[in-house]
Amino acid sequence: MSVDEFRFIVEKIRPFTSYIYLHVLGEPLLHPHLDEILSVAESNGLNINITTNGSLLQQKKEILLKHKIRQINISLHDAEENISSDKWSDYLKTALEFATIMAPTTYICLRLWNSTNENSVSFNVQCLKEITSAFNLSKEELSKETTGNGLKLAEHIFLQRSPRFEWPDKDQSGEQTRKTCYALRDHIAILSDGQVVPCCLDADANMKLGDIFTEDLADILETKKAIDIKKGFEQRKVVEPICATCGFSTLL
């Protein structure tokens, strides 16, 4: 998505929201025009939220520091699968140092979404060790059960632990036909090619509602498909088969 395309989208969505979340699937800090993208969002008065795997925090630190960003979510669990174990400590130290630097003006959510995965034990032990050291916390304090925003580590810094969930998969059959979801209730997603979908997990546009570049957002949200999906979730009913395969609703 180019900067001009992003600017066009911001103009289209601005009457509907004051919040923007720069993620669907992929790493937002990889965008070659990140600085300009953030400037456009900021100049339009949008509350900027970013979800990142944390691998580029050091490289992009100066860009992130110069902008007013409401919240940055750092998916620590991603490092377990994508970084060799001998580099976990360096990765975690960088992420925690970045969190401390940004915290005066930005909320930082450290995500550890793998709490039920037995294979993640050693990685999680390493994470909690680094966190207790960085924030001078005891193991007992770190093991407290929390909900919502998670455990407060310091001012504006939180640790959020959740089970790993299954992403929706159109090639699988699902039996969870009664569930609710945030889709179309408090958010939609717009993919890099302009396709509008109900939620941030539909990265392949399996439930395409429209195209932001050729249609008005108000018209897209009033399509029969969008209305049926939203009403379905309000009644805890799955309308789209792919939603029956999604595990995120178990976290709601």
Region spans (language model):
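Conserved glycine-rich "GG(E/T)P / GGGxP" loop and the immediately following alpha-helix
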Residues: 1-143
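Active-site-flanking alpha-helical
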Residues: 34, 199-200
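C-terminal accessory region of radical SAM enzymes
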Residues: 101-108, 133-176, 201-251
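Short, small/polar residue-rich loop motifs at catalytic or cofactor-binding pockets
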Residues: 182-184
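Short hydrophobic/aromatic beta-strand element in the GNAT-like acyltransferase core
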Residues: 187
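Short, acidic, Ser/Thr-enriched surface-loop or helix-capping motifs
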Residues: 190-191
